[in-house]
Design a protein with these regions (language model features):
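Conserved hydrolase catalytic core segment
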Residues: 196-235
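Alpha/beta-hydrolase
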Residues: 255-343, 350
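Catalytic histidine-centered segment of alpha/beta-hydrolase-like enzymes
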Residues: 388-397
């Protein structure tokens, strides 16, 4: 009996233990099931959050990309609106304003013409560079009123400025062709405005072509005017420029530009200086205040006026830059280097006048003054314009226009 009772007790204990184990296991299983459900829900929630975040990022990236693409398009649109391609006009009934491209000797040439009175004498401005359109400065600097005394013709040579096109024949840009073009343009203007002669003014690099053309055909011109006249491409020119820049940088204590200056030149045994990098030299010249526009950088004096000019359309501005770059690589660029007009052009049959800014060391005014003193001509005079560097007509238009008016009065009827 005792053994049976003991077995019953053991059975009850085992049954109770088994029941406890079963209930515990069920509880654990339920907790594990609940735990799994929680984890799965959290994972699903986190995944949904991740997908939402990715969608948000994608949307933001699309917006950023659209903005990046839109900014240059907006700027291009604004630039196009700033570039209507229109030139000055006048209220006077007898005035003339024109902008056009025409064929000269088989190549496109561009013209800007401004004049308040058609009876005024014609002044042909032979552009700088060669390859740089100068009407941009007339567009930028509104105080210049030369058109009150002359019918002013700004000439863009073949394939430059508004005459540039993608079929430009760079091989045709030679000194002989440009001299022949100058003669043809002169004859066209004489015929169009019913004039026996005209005035011709060469500006900077354009003075090389204009001076040679006046020597070839003096019968076409009342007078020669050299503004920022190129006199020589010799070491003497480089030396005068160097001495000016060195003096300015030393007075400023500008060690950085002094170092750049020395890197750009070679000191010769003769005591002269030879420039090894013209573009660095000109950049330093602007820094020193003797460049295109006094006390203005190359960007301020040249690039910004081109960008903001109203006289060009957007496509014409692009053509302007392409043409300018093309001209630097032409045969003309080689043919007009290594010159010295003190040796090759010592006499003119027409009156000769020279206009330089007091701070012009691109074409140093001292060399221009000395050239004026040595050249033989029926009349001659050197004008030094205060407050100006390389572009006196636009930097100090009042004094420069007064000088040109005086030239007209002394030569037109004399």
């Amino acid at each position: 009996m005792q053994k049976a009772a003991a077995r019953d007790k053991r059975g009850c204990f085992l049954f109770g233990a088994a029941d406890f184990i079963r209930k515990t296991a069920a509880s654990i299983k339920l907790q594990l099931h609940n735990l799994d459900n929680v984890k799965i829900a959290d994972i699903i929630f986190e995944c949904r959050q991740c997908q939402d975040w990715r969608r948000i990022v994608r949307k933001k990236m699309v917006i950023i990309i659209l903005c990046i693409l839109a900014v240059p398009l907006v700027l291009l649109g604004v630039w196009a609106l700033m570039s209507p391609g229109k030139i000055r006009t006048y209220k006077e009934s007898d005035s003339i304003s024109g902008k056009f491209v025409m064929d000269i000797n088989g190549a496109p040439n561009g013209f800007f013409i401004n004049g308040k009175y058609k009876d005024n004498p014609v002044l042909l401005l032979v552009s700088s560079g060669p390859g740089t359109d100068d009407y941009v400065f007339t567009d930028k600097y509104k105080d210049m009123k030369l058109e009150e005394d002359f019918t002013v013709v700004y000439w863009d040579y073949r394939y430059m400025g508004i005459a540039y096109n993608n079929n430009a024949d760079a091989d045709s840009i030679t000194l002989d062709n440009l001299l022949n073009d100058t003669e043809a343009v002169t004859n066209y203007l004489k015929e169009r405005f019913n004039k026996d002669k005209i005035y011709i003014m060469g500006f900077s690099g354009g003075s090389k072509i204009a001076l040679m053309e006046v020597q070839r055909h003096p019968e076409n011109y009342y007078a020669y005017i050299g503004m920022a006249q190129c006199v020589t491409d010799s070491e003497e020119n480089d030396t005068v420029m160097y001495n000016f820049m060195k003096d300015v940088f030393e007075r400023r204590g500008d060690k950085k530009n002094l170092a750049r200056l020395e890197e750009a030149v070679t000191h010769l045994d003769s005591g002269n200086i030879k420039c090894n990098d013209w573009y660095v030299y000109v950049d330093l010249l602007h820094e020193a205040g003797g460049g295109t526009i006094k006390d203005k950088s190359e960007f301020e004096g040249i690039t910004w006026p081109i960008i903001t000019a109203k006289c060009y359309t957007l496509s014409e501005k692009i053509g302007y830059v392409k043409g300018m770059k093309m001209y630097r690589k032409t045969k003309l660029a080689e043919e007009t280097d290594n010159f010295d007009y003190r040796k090759t052009i010592t006499e003119l049959e027409v009156p000769a006048f020279f206009i330089s800014g007091e701070s012009d060391y691109n074409c140093p005014w001292e060399l221009v003054r000395d050239y004026c003193e040595m050249i033989k001509a029926p009349q001659k005079h050197f004008y030094k314009i205060q407050g100006a560097a390389h572009s006196p007509l636009w930097e100090n238009p009042k004094d420069t226009c007064r000088a040109l008016r005086e030239i007209k009065e002394n030569t037109l009827y004399g």
